[in-house]
């Protein structure tokens, strides 16, 4: 049976992604100075304005307006004619401390000792919120990710690359990509369509942009054996994309949660990642669930695996750890679930310890996906539990 599946990505200059990167850059700067800080940092952008708000409890000071301007500058909004630029935009901050009602559920242990935690202390550090988190992996790509989202991310990164290195100097920071992949018997067989929307200078005509993007972006990223004469390529299909970025659309942290994860191929628990310190299970448990799923697929226990974990606020042990291999498992899902509980400790403090999450590693994943990033050394992408999983599975 043949079917189509589509995923999209956005460039680092997309308004929502600007916000994600500012929120995570602030988080990183705080974690450099105070690894035990509590951070829930939200950003909004619109024409000429950045608003940073949230709850931050820390012993250190960081210059939030400077961080925001540095991110905007790095992305490429450096000229007033773009309608938004690092030097002239206003930055407003509204920061409170974390609610003591939330903190009491997370602070119970002797966490402030800064040392090794005993099992009792790990058990006493509850989840920072209720909720369900999803992790996923499949063997469609070398990154063990679904092909549509990986190709969409690579196209978006390539758009930024050719803009920044001068290959296509008329491009501007905002942009979106979309890839539709055709599957046969649940395996990707061809790319059915590609959509690239790239912000550009007003003086460049559409034919030039279309030709350049097909040559320097699409043909560089999409494997030749995945395209054929029927593959459809759309470049700026409206014909013009001059007005973009926060001047054209306001942006908010946490509005690209499907782009950040699996492109809609797997389910999503609903919680965003950026701007949240690792005591927030929205972030840390989603990373841990990906770590579990990736190791299961890498170990050959299944071709495809979705892991769902759920928590209650203030309670350390997950309420559930559910495994679904969609009929691709070498052993039953129930057996894999039992093995996972032996191999992985999914209590929040144990996740933070095992993945070493109290580090400034978050801005780098705030654009182009949090998973499948072979260009980065991310702890949740390691496949270091493969041998023990195989041993316990008897394969």
Curated annotation (Swiss-Prot):
Sites where the protein binds Mg(2+): 16
Alphabetized Gene3D superfamilies for the sequence: 3.30.300.10
Cited CDD domains: S-AdoMet_synt
Record keywords, A-Z: ATP-binding, Cytoplasm, Magnesium, Metal-binding, Nucleotide-binding, One-carbon metabolism, Potassium, Transferase
GO cellular component: cytoplasm
Substrates-to-products reaction catalysed: L-methionine + ATP + H2O = S-adenosyl-L-methionine + phosphate + diphosphate
Reported cofactor(s): Mg(2+); K(+)
Localization per record: Cytoplasm
Residues binding L-methionine, per UniProt: 55, 98, 249, 280
GO molecular function: ATP binding; magnesium ion binding; methionine adenosyltransferase activity
Primary role: Catalyzes the formation of S-adenosylmethionine (AdoMet) from methionine and ATP. The overall synthetic reaction is composed of two sequential steps, AdoMet formation and the subsequent tripolyphosphate hydrolysis which occurs prior to release of AdoMet from the enzyme.
Name the UniProt record assigns to this protein: S-adenosylmethionine synthase
Organism: Caldanaerobacter subterraneus subsp. tengcongensis (strain DSM 15242 / JCM 11007 / NBRC 100824 / MB4)
Gene field: metK
């Amino acid at each position: 049976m043949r079917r189509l599946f589509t995923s999209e990505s956005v460039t680092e200059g997309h308004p929502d992604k600007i916000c994600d990167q500012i929120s995570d850059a602030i988080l990183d700067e705080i974690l450099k100075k105070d690894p035990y800080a509590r951070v829930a940092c939200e950003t909004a952008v619109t024409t000429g304005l950045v608003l940073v708000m949230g709850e931050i409890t820390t012993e250190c000071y960081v210059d939030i307006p400077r961080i925001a301007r540095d991110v905007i500058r790095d992305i490429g909004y450096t000229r007033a004619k773009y309608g938004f630029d690092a030097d002239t935009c206003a930055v407003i901050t509204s920061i409170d401390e974390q609610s003591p009602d939330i903190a009491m559920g997370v602070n119970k242990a002797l966490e402030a000792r800064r040392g090794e935690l005993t099992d009792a202390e790990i058990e006493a550090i509850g989840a920072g919120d209720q909720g369900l988190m999803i992790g996923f992996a499949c063997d469609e790509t070398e990154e063990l990710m679904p092909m549509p989202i990986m190709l969409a991310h690579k196209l978006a990164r390539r758009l930024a690359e050719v803009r920044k290195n001068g290959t296509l100097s008329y491009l501007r920071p905002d942009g979106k990509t979309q890839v539709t992949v055709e599957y046969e018997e649940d395996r990707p067989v061809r790319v059915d369509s590609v959509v690239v929307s790239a912000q550009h200078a007003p003086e460049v005509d559409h034919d030039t942009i279309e030709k350049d993007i097909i040559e320097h972006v699409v043909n560089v990223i999409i494997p030749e054996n995945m395209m054929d004469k029927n593959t459809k390529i759309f470049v700026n299909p409206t014909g013009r994309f001059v007005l973009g970025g926060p001047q054209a659309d306001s942006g908010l942290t946490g509005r690209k949660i499907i782009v950040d994860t699996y492109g809609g191929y797997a389910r999503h628990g609903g919680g965003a990642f950026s701007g949240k310190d690792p005591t927030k299970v929205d972030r840390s448990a989603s990373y841990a669930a990906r770590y579990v799923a990736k190791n299961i697929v890498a170990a050959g226990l299944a071709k495809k695996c979705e892991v769902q974990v759920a928590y209650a606020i203030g309670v350390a042990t997950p309420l559930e750890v559910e495994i679904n291999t969609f009929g691709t498992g070498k052993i039953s899902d129930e057996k894999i679930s039992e093995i996972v509980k032996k191999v992985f400790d999914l209590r929040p403090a144990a996740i933070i310890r095992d993945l070493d999450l109290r580090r400034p590693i978050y801005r780098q994943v705030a654009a182009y996906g949090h998973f499948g990033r072979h260009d980065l050394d991310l702890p949740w992408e390691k496949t270091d539990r493969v041998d023990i999983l195989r041993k316990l599975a008897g394969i």
